[in-house]
């Protein structure tokens, strides 16, 4: 599936990426190749293949949760570029 330059620009806008014209051309080619690979996978007959949730049969070994004292807010915010009361302040990204 060949993507158009406009489609790549639209995806870049949605991802809030600013691309140079060279990057737009490169991503048009690369994303088209990825979509071609996905189309190939979609055309495979996998009816006889049993579903798997994990590639290996090992189970996760998790440690027990143990509560312990945390850092005081002053110490954890000591190197923060911006803070609001006892929280990190970050730029708003959703309009």
Swiss-Prot record:
InterPro entries: Asp/Glu-ADT_sf_sub_c, GatC. It comes from the Bacteria. Pfam families: GatC. Its EC number is 6.3.5.-. SUPFAM superfamilies: Glu-tRNAGln amidotransferase C subunit (SSF141000). The keyword Nucleotide-binding applies. Keywords: ATP-binding, Ligase, Nucleotide-binding, Protein biosynthesis. One of its GO terms (biological process) is regulation of translational fidelity. It catalyses: L-glutamyl-tRNA(Gln) + L-glutamine + ATP + H2O = L-glutaminyl-tRNA(Gln) + L-glutamate + ADP + phosphate + H(+); L-aspartyl-tRNA(Asn) + L-glutamine + ATP + H2O = L-asparaginyl-tRNA(Asn) + L-glutamate + ADP + phosphate + 2 H(+). One of its GO terms (molecular function) is asparaginyl-tRNA synthase (glutamine-hydrolyzing) activity. Residues 51-95 are annotated as: Disordered. Heterotrimer of A, B and C subunits. Allows the formation of correctly charged Asn-tRNA(Asn) or Gln-tRNA(Gln) through the transamidation of misacylated Asp-tRNA(Asn) or Glu-tRNA(Gln) in organisms which lack either or both of asparaginyl-tRNA or glutaminyl-tRNA synthetases. The reaction takes place in the presence of glutamine and ATP through an activated phospho-Asp-tRNA(Asn) or phospho-Glu-tRNA(Gln). PANTHER family: GLUTAMYL-TRNA(GLN) AMIDOTRANSFERASE SUBUNIT C, MITOCHONDRIAL. Belongs to the GatC family. This is Aspartyl/glutamyl-tRNA(Asn/Gln) amidotransferase subunit C. It comes from Myxococcus xanthus (strain DK1622). The lineage of its organism: Bacteria, Pseudomonadati, Myxococcota, Myxococcia, Myxococcales.
């Amino acid at each position: 599936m060949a993507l158009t330059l406009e489609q790549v620009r639209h995806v870049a806008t949605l991802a809030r990426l600013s691309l140079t014209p060279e990057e737009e051309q490169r991503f048009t080619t690369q994303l088209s190749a990825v979509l071609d690979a996905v189309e190939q996978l979609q055309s495979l007959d996998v009816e006889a293949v049993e579903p798997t949730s994990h590639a290996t049969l090992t189970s996760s070994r998790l440690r027990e949760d143990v509560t312990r004292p945390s850092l005081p807010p002053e110490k954890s915010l000591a190197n923060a570029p911006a803070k609001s009361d006892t929280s990190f302040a970050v730029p708003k990204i959703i309009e």
